[in-house]
């Protein structure tokens, strides 16, 4: 029985070698088998902090017995293996430190540490691995461009996609003027617009991001009166107003929630308690905390100590 070949140094050669075929007299490992191993990027990226233009590249790896390994991105992505490798066609070389890895029987590529704007590509085989970090500059702008184009096709016939696009812009503080148009489309576009709590709240969020708070408040006054406005949605809006320091308006919202949802015996009382606390009416705040705690639902029992602490502070005059 023949001995099994070692992966690194035998199946995968070290350094650059003359493979005895093709035009290359000093070829790196093809980072795979048979045809050219390739990697494609739809947009410009950074590899280990270095710029690489969008496109498809031949991917090679200079494997060394000691020290760093080097990833090579070649402009030639069509030649067979590395038999015709030409360093003059290199688009980028990046040195990386190889690492010890959990045993992997088969050559494996994958992506780890995935985030919105970056990820790490890795190769693992046997007990070794090598990786490179990919960063996408201006990822939010790229995403908005994709969404803008998608809204011109079938996704554009669903109001929720317009709403989601506007929300993305608000969350990332980009493209706000167009986001306002998208939010309005979700509300009032012929055949697809839906005027409901969520679409109005989205428009208000865009207006707030544009520092048009007075207009946003008018939109939210309308939103909380929508049939789709739930107890929790209105309550959360009140909490948002509290966080913004608008205690008077927050109390008005909590009072409206209480008035329009008499069947609710907990959340609306919590809202009133917080609202009255914010405006300095301790008597009403204590009364509403006591009622809320008395009606505590099972799914809130984990927060009982927090509610009791709020009540205790009020009773102690703190």
Predicted feature descriptions by range:
Residues 1-54, 60-161:
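Extended, well-structured beta-strand/loop surface patches
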Residues 77-84, 276-278, 309-313:
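Short alpha-helical linear motifs
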Residues 147-154, 187, 191, 224-225, ...:
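A conserved position within tetratricopeptide repeats
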Residues 150-153, 266, 274, 313:
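Acidic, polar-rich low-complexity tracts and alpha-helical solenoid repeat scaffolds
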Residues 160-271:
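Alpha-helical adaptor scaffolds
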Residues 267-274, 278, 282-283:
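Extended alpha-helical scaffolding segments
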Residues 283-318:
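Terminal, low-structured helical/coil segments at or just beyond the last alpha-helical repeat
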């Amino acid at each position: 029985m023949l001995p099994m070949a070692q992966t690194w140094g035998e199946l995968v050669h070290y350094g650059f070698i003359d493979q005895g075929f093709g035009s290359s007299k000093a070829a790196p490992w093809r980072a795979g088998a048979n045809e050219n191993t390739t990697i494609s990027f739809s947009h410009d990226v950074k590899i280990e902090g270095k710029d690489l233009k969008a496109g498809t590249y031949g991917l090679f790896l200079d494997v060394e017995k000691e020290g760093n390994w080097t990833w090579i991105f070649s402009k030639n992505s069509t030649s067979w293996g590395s038999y015709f490798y030409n360093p003059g066609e290199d688009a980028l070389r990046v040195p990386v430190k190889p690492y010890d890895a959990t045993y992997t029987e088969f050559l494996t590529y994958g992506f780890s540490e995935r985030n919105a704007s970056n990820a790490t590509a890795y190769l693992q085989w046997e007990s070794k691995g090598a990786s490179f970090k990919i960063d996408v500059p201006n990822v939010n702008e790229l995403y908005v461009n994709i969404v803008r184009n998608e809204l011109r096709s079938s996704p554009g016939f669903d109001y929720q996609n317009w709403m989601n696009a506007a929300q993305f812009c608000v969350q990332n503080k980009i493209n706000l003027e167009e986001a306002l148009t998208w939010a309005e489309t979700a509300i009032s576009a012929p055949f697809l617009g839906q005027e409901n709590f969520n679409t109005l709240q989205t428009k208000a969020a865009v207006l707030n991001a544009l520092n048009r708070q007075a207009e946003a408040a008018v939109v939210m006054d309308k939103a909380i009166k929508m049939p789709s406005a739930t107890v929790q949605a209105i309550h959360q809006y009140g909490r948002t107003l509290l966080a913004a320091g608008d205690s008077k308006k927050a109390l008005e919202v909590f009072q409206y929630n209480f008035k329009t949802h008499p069947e609710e015996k907990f959340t609306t009382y919590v809202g009133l308690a917080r609202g009255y606390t914010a405006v300095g009416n301790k008597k009403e705040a204590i009364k509403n905390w006591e009622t809320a705690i008395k009606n505590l639902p099972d799914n809130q029992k984990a927060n009982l100590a927090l509610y009791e602490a709020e009540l205790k502070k009020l009773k102690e005059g703190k």
